[in-house]
A protein has these predicted regions:
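Entry/capping segment at the start of metal-dependent catalytic domains
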Residues: 7-96, 272, 289, 306
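C-terminal solvent-exposed extensions
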Residues: 44-54, 59-61, 74, 80, ...
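Flexible, polar/acidic helix-loop-strand segments at domain edges
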Residues: 59-60, 159-246, 328
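Extracytoplasmic
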Residues: 59-62, 81-86, 95-103, 114, ...
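Second-shell loop/turn segments in exported
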Residues: 73-77, 117-125, 140-145, 201, ...
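Soluble non-cytosolic domains of exported or imported proteins
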Residues: 79-83, 113-114, 122-130, 148-152, ...
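Extracytoplasmic/secreted envelope proteins and their assembly/folding machinery
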Residues: 85, 116, 128-136, 151-155, ...
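Amphipathic, coiled-coil-like alpha-helical scaffolding segments used for oligomerization/assembly
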Residues: 125-189, 266
Length: 328
């Protein structure tokens, strides 16, 4: 009996040591990666408390706002630019879904305790926290964290995964040409090495420059409505590429792209997401957009061109989509 008891405690000690080493390794790895991010702490700033207005279905859901800006500078610099692309990534463990919800940049919104303007300009005039406050105030969902990138970020992120396969129409290729030129000028690359022609329409392997140009198109198809769809396709493509990477490839990817990302995700947040990642990649991916069909109209006035929306219908849809239709 004593021998068995000794063996049991010895095994328990070995398992404990392994657990401690694994935890220490995870801590060191996360610390290494977090140090490469551009961290912007917004935790001490005013924030509209929306969570209390939601029912219990909101518990456990994490909403991360993806912000794509057109400042043409590395994230973290003072030049804000406009919020060119906005997407709420909602992770819902209860429904086992990740919902990607694009927000149209030209929606007319009420900036809390201030003026009305386009959603994109609420970032330009007030930065990240004002943008988050505006989204929470107008759409009734809490934003837990944000991730900010610009077109230089996109070039580096897409190249780091080896490019993305996209179905591109001739109309999109036509409008991409000028955007490819401007992105090449931005990053100091050759236009001739990256140009595409309309007769190449179909399934294409896009590099970082071409993907950034693909995201910048505004006038192909249904204008900005299709632009939001292209953004969701790119995010889904990046997710698929990351999910297929080995640990070595993921390490190289993280070291390459993290310096091009600004976020308020803390070390604790990142550890939590890493631990949930193996489960999350198996979640259903839902693609959505605000405004929903039949709930918007276009307005031109002295302040510009706007997308005006039925807020009640869109808030109800957004909350139902994110929280699984279980909110009261």
């Amino acid at each position: 009996m004593k021998k068995k008891k000794f063996t049991f405690w010895k095994l328990l000690l070995i398992l404990l040591i392994i657990a401690v080493i694994a935890a220490a390794g995870l801590y060191i790895a996360v610390t290494h990666y977090v140090s490469k991010l551009n961290f912007e702490d917004t935790s001490g700033e005013d924030n509209f408390s929306i969570v209390d207005s939601l029912a219990d279905g909101a518990t456990g859901v994490k909403n991360i706002l993806l912000i794509g800006v057109d400042n043409d500078y590395a994230p973290g610099m003072d030049e804000l630019g406009n919020a060119d692309g906005l997407m709420i990534v909602s992770i819902n463990p209860k429904t086992r879904q990740v919902v990607l919800t694009s927000l149209m940049r030209d929606i007319r919104v009420q900036v809390p305790d201030s003026y009305k303007t386009k959603l994109t300009l609420s970032y330009h005039y007030g930065g990240t926290q004002q943008l988050i406050d505006t989204i929470e105030y107008n759409f009734g969902v809490p934003i837990d964290n944000y991730v900010l990138v610009n077109y230089i970020s996109v070039v580096n992120i897409v190249d780091a995964v080896g490019g993305l396969t996209m179905d591109v129409t001739a109309d999109e290729l036509y409008w991409m040409d000028d955007k490819i030129r401007s992105v090449c000028d931005l990053v100091g690359a050759s236009y001739e090495d990256n140009m595409l022609s309309t007769d190449q329409a179909g399934e294409l392997e896009l590099n970082g420059i071409q993907t950034a140009a693909f995201l910048r198109i505004r006038y192909a198809g249904n204008n900005d409505f299709e632009r939001t769809e292209r953004a969701r396709r790119v995010v889904l493509g990046l997710k698929d590429k990351a999910a297929a990477m080995s640990l070595t490839e993921l390490d190289s990817f993280a070291n390459t792209v993290l310096p091009y990302i600004t976020t308020d995700l803390t070390q604790t947040d990142i550890v939590s997401l890493l631990l949930r990642f193996p489960a999350m990649i198996k979640y259903d991916m839902i693609s959505d957009r605000i405004p929903i069909e039949g709930s918007y109209w276009f307005t031109n006035d002295d302040n510009g061109s706007f997308v005006d929306i039925d807020y009640d219908a869109n808030k109800e849809h957004l909350q139902s989509s994110i929280y699984g239709g279980e909110l009261s």
